[in-house]
UniProtKB/Swiss-Prot annotation:
Keywords: Calcium, Capsid protein, Disulfide bond, Glycoprotein, Host endoplasmic reticulum, Host-virus interaction, Metal-binding, Outer capsid protein, Signal, T=13 icosahedral capsid protein, Virion. The keyword Calcium applies. This is Outer capsid glycoprotein VP7. Some rotavirus strains are neuraminidase-sensitive and require sialic acid to attach to the cell surface. Some rotavirus strains are integrin-dependent. Some rotavirus strains depend on ganglioside for their entry into the host cell. Hsp70 also seems to be involved in the entry of some strains. In group A rotaviruses, VP7 defines the G serotype. Residues 1-50 form the signal peptide. Belongs to the rotavirus VP7 family. Calcium-binding protein that interacts with rotavirus cell receptors once the initial attachment by VP4 has been achieved. Rotavirus attachment and entry into the host cell probably involves multiple sequential contacts between the outer capsid proteins VP4 and VP7, and the cell receptors. Following entry into the host cell, low intracellular or intravesicular Ca(2+) concentration probably causes the calcium-stabilized VP7 trimers to dissociate from the virion. This step is probably necessary for the membrane-disrupting entry step and the release of VP4, which is locked onto the virion by VP7.
């Protein structure tokens, strides 16, 4: 009986020693592989140029989408520039090769061929409905029109700032603006906005909540409306939802990779005169109106000075990411 017990103990000890030896062998083998792999990486690293391709993750609910796709810092050699211009510019120039000509001229200022993109829009109103600013630097040309000053100033406020927005269900809820940065932004083919301020008993102040015809009209048949009401007061809203979408937005701060250039007009539209807008006149500029060729020549000549007052950002404006927030 004792012999059997001794044999069992001896077998267990031998098994334990054997397992320990195997584990040590595996450990030595893994160490050899890991160290050899790290050695190869260290040797090859100086000869390999890598680039970080970030994942395109839209911030749904914000009009801003992150784009990170650069490990270089040279401003012009690796940056993209978008130039937005009205349709009338191409019509007046009437030259199929005019973009190629400008690309060659931008090359003399350090902007490589293929880094400058020309984006055409029909008019200020249509551009307001779906502005998309994708480049590292974005310059928007707006031809001055005395009848469109409000549209121009609201568009400038929209694209020169970053906004975080949520959808609004005006059929079920009342809404209030909490502070100066809180605005309601409406976009669509035709936006008519009416509001009815409410007292603490949710009764209309100067209006009937059940009768939209008694509401106060703050915008009529516009494509872009930035509505500002009295902070801290609930409001019942009436909006032409069939042709317009309204959102509750918070101004996050300046969008520093965008500049607006007013073409013509006796004075520049100063959106900083609006008490809801922080001073940012450096990125709101004006050039004299002559002919569109002259306008573009001026832009090319001063493009680097214009870019100097901007900041390259990793955010682009896309109204498609503007609708919902997770």
């Amino acid at each position: 009986m004792y012999g059997i017990e001794y044999t069992t103990i001896l077998t267990x000890l031998i098994s334990l020693i054997f397992i320990t030896y195997i584990l040590k062998s595996i450990t030595r083998t893994m160490d050899f592989i890991i160290y050899r792999f790290l050695f190869v990486i260290v040797v090859l690293a100086p000869f390999v140029k890598t680039q970080n391709y970030g994942i395109n993750l839209p911030i749904t609910g914000s009009m801003d989408t992150p784009y990170m796709n650069s490990t270089m810092s040279e401003t012009f050699l690796t940056s993209t520039l978008c130039l937005y211009y009205p349709h009338e510019a191409a019509t007046q120039i009437a030259d199929d090769k005019w973009k190629d000509t400008l690309s060659q001229l931008f090359l003399t200022k350090g902007w490589s061929t293929g880094s400058v993109y020309f984006k055409e829009y029909t008019d200020i109103a249509s551009f307001s409905v779906d502005p998309q600013l994708y480049c590292d630097y974005n310059i928007v040309l707006m031809k001055y029109d005395g009848n469109s000053q409000l549209d121009m100033s609201e568009l400038a406020d929209l694209i020169l700032n970053e906004w975080l927005c949520n959808p609004m269900d005006i059929t079920l809820y009342y809404y209030q603006q909490t502070d100066e940065a809180n605005k309601w932004i409406s976009m669509g083919n035709s936006c008519t906005i009416k509001v009815c301020p409410l007292n603490t008993q949710t009764l209309g102040i100067g209006c009937l909540t059940t009768d939209p015809t008694t509401f106060e009209e703050v915008a009529s048949a516009e494509k872009l409306v930035i509505t500002d009401v009295v902070d801290g007061v609930n409001h019942k809203l009436d909006v032409t939802t069939a042709t317009c979408t309204i959102r509750n937005c918070k101004k996050l701060g300046p969008r520093e990779n965008v500049a607006v250039i007013q073409v013509g007009g006796s004075n520049i539209l100063d959106i900083t005169a609006d008490p809801t807008t922080a001073p940012q006149t450096e990125r709101m500029m004006r050039i004299n109106w002559k002919k569109w060729w002259q306008v573009f020549y001026t832009i090319v000549d001063y493009v680097n000075q214009i870019v100097q007052v901007m900041s390259k950002r990793s955010r682009s404006l896309n109204s498609a990411a503007f609708y919902y927030r997770i």
